[in-house]
Amino acid sequence: MKQIKLKEPKNGSELVLETLLELGIDTVFGYPGGAVLPLYDAIYNFKGIRHILGRHEQGCLHEAEGYAKSTGKLGVAIVTSGPGATNAITGIADAMSDSVPLLVFTGQVARAGIGKDAFQEADIVGITMPITKYNYQVRETADIPRIITEAVHIATTGRPGPVVIDLPKDVSALETDFIYSPEVNLPSYQPTLVPNDMQIKKILKQLSKAKKPVLLAGGGISYAEASKELNEFAERYQIPVVTSLLGQGTIATSHPLFLGMGGMHGSFAANIAMTETDFMISIGCRFDDRLTGNPKTFAKNAKVAHIDIDPAEIGKIISADIPVVGDAKKALQMLLAEPTVHNNTEKWIEKVTKDKNRVRSYDKKERVVQPQAVIERIGELTNGDAIVVTDVGQHQMWAAQYYPYQNERQLVTSGGLGTMGFGVPAAIGAKIANPEKEVILFVGDGGYQMTNQEMAILNIYKVPIKVIMLNNHSLGMVRQWQEAFYDGRTSESVFDTLPDFQLMAQAYGVKSYKFDDPETIVQDLEVLKEDIPMFIEVDISRKEHVLPMVPAGKSNHEMLGVKFHA
């Protein structure tokens, strides 16, 4: 077993940093406090790891998420004990929902004070048990390198997810020898990566019989970096592709086989195809309720093959006729390696293409700036190549529907948990991880006010993201549901008074603009070409709805607001 032993003893905090460095980690996001002072003292003179100081622990977690989601690398965050750790809970839960590889260090009171209601003590191991892939509390300083190495392995392998390491203050201050081994010995944790060969053959056998096959591409395609294989498989067998929200970008929106995003705010063609298919091949998708609608009627006439790296997801919501446990990339490679089977989807492709082309995207209006048009214009200005980050709400769905995605990991959003406040810090994390890429953030006036303090980072760390606020002076998605299902009673969803967002941005040293003229908006958005941190507020109508929409509990074919060409 390979080991590295340094001559001089190190304290626990130095062990943390040395181990992270050995594991190739060079960036962490954090916020100091009493229980992590030894760790921050070690950071002061440590070379090789960059620390980004957030402005709130939730922001630090979302920054780490944006870093991880946009790259596939591990995101790392450090917070203190008690309120610092509890402030991080939302980010940890968000990462768990979306399978984001995170390593979160939480400070803890000294071992002698644990369980005695010490100042700033919280049982973070107990609190995070349901929302982490695994968690640790370090009891001995010498265990730090092993625990971190295991934690990184767990967070980044199999189905990725967050791992918490609770670090008592005295453990981080005591000295010991630094003995590091890159090897991990976890007999009880052995994720299945290679699918069963017989199950792969069953998929192809069923495909040869299918007249109306559909590929459903989820976020697992991005995590496995399997977009190339997905496209090759779809093209070989001429299978139309539907994506989940997190699967956006796994196939280019311009690809003739792409039908759109499926589900509650999915496209007409995608939802009808999922309803009428006779064979669905789902890859890296967990069939959440926003995608399936009524699970009893979802793909009701179809045989279903479900490929997922997490066996717990298979059969949990939609029964699988052909269950396949394994890595999405490996599964697709095995499907492609098999002899090509004969299938004929010509009539099916003709039908779904007709469905795709018969729908109008949205009604063009002259008197108001339309959010759809803003997103389309930004797609043109960025050549469809920007990393798009969103907060949560109507703007999130419009960004999913109207930006021309081309690549995996191009859309960074909060899918499973739907966390308002995700946007600003996640965009910061994405830009720090991808300094050469354009990062565009779409955010609403509601979500922006939850974490806008992170805007302080933009000039301090030279992070030139472009913040596009689509301001409808309300909690737009809440208001939309109230108008649709609560007889228009917009209870507490309309903001009668707002801060001056221009002055707020300027207070953080960020150049700001406000646009509200539909006649000039196309030219106005040219300012995005400037490579500086930028805040653009675009006034849009309060009346705009995200369409189509499948009401909660209804089947996917029961869409509201579909508009057809005359």
Give the location of each predicted region:
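N-terminal alpha/beta PP-like core and its mobile active-site loop of ThDP/TPP-dependent enzymes
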Residues: 2-341, 377, 381-384, 464-467, ...
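Thiamine diphosphate
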Residues: 119-120, 314-317, 323-325, 329-333, ...
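Generic enzyme active-site microenvironment
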Residues: 164, 306, 389, 442-443
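A general structural motif
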Residues: 57, 116-117, 190-202, 262-266, ...
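Active-site nucleophile and cofactor-binding loops and adjacent substrate-binding regions
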Residues: 31-33, 52-62, 77-84, 139-140, ...
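Active-site diphosphate/adenylate-binding microenvironment
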Residues: 13-17, 21-26, 39-43, 353-430, ...
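Phosphate/pyrophosphate-binding active-site segments
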Residues: 2-7, 142, 301-394, 503, ...
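Well-ordered beta-strand positions enriched in small/hydrophobic/aromatic, beta-favoring residues
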Residues: 75-77, 165, 388, 411, ...
